[in-house]
Amino acid sequence: MKKLIYLWLLASVLLAVACTDDDDVFSEESGVRLQAVIDECNTTLRGAENGWKMVYYPKVESYGGYTFLFKFGTKNRVQMISDFDMSEDTDYSYNFNTSESVVLTFDSYSPLHRLADPQYPAPDYSNKKGYGVEGDFEFVVKKVTADTLYLVGKKNRVEVLLTKATGEDWLLVSMMAEMSSCFALSENERLGMSVHGVLMASGLVELDDIYNICKISYKDEEGDAVSVESPYIMTDKGCQFIQEIEVAGIKFSGLNVDLSEGFNNREFVSNDEGGSIRFFIQNFAPLNLTRDQIPTYVPNKNIASVDLLRTTNGNDVR
């Protein structure tokens, strides 16, 4: 009986050792494979003369898109620019880890992190904070080819591509970043609207330059309220909507920025053939006018606060 017990114990020990050896072998093989993928990624990323381009829609059809350019270098450094950030400091760090297969992570705060920043009120969640644009700064590498890396956001699971960039891309994205500053309105600024040169008093445009959303409200010929909304992505001339929209019977797919009168008097022009609709800055900040000055103030389409004062004080002379 004792011999049987000893034999059983010996078999158990040998089995445990065998299993441990197998686990080590498989673990080692897996680690080697993952390191090979990481090496391939680094070689591919660092070998692109003009770097890489990412056109990223974190939540397509809800929010707009964003364009990034990357130039990967040694010592895990990466040069990064975007279509919304004009910072002179473009040097950041990146790394690979194996938390989920192979993961490309940008591990210093960069423009990519803004898309995951929870401080911004989210339109899809009744403007509550805590969600951000629902972007990622960690991406699971699914496939690597000579000119494309196929990625999936680690948290939000949105597929995105890294494709080889051109020298022209760097110029265009810099121009997009300059254009994006035109879409940032101050607290007291709104956009008024004219169609074929005729002012539409009911027209109002809201630009959300964090989530890249354009919302246009107006009244049609029957006096019914109409609201049209579209996410957009920046271009070197203005913005492009994700789909064509129709406003006051005019179809267009984006806005071009007119800076001919200077930045403060910039206008946004529909990109239909005739540039039929123009959106202009209106300032709602209070003016230091006396009651007697209000009725005689010369109208200015860019200063809406005067019209508000006239109506409020019973001096509406329109």
Predicted segment positions?
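C-terminal motif of bacterial Sec signal peptides marking the signal peptidase cleavage site
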Residues: 15-18
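Sec-dependent signal peptide recognition
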Residues: 2-10
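A short, compositionally biased
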Residues: 47-48, 73-76, 145-146, 210-212, ...
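Acidic/polar, low-complexity intrinsically disordered N-terminal segments immediately downstream
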Residues: 20-103, 168-188
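Long, acidic/polar, low-complexity amphipathic helices and coiled-coil-like
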Residues: 77-221
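Preference for solvent-exposed, low-hydrophobicity sequence contexts
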Residues: 155-159, 164-317
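Short solvent-exposed loop/turn micro-motifs enriched in small/polar/acidic residues
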Residues: 62-64, 87, 132-134, 225, ...
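Short, structured motif recognition centered on aromatic/hydrophobic residues
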Residues: 70-78, 151, 268-269, 313
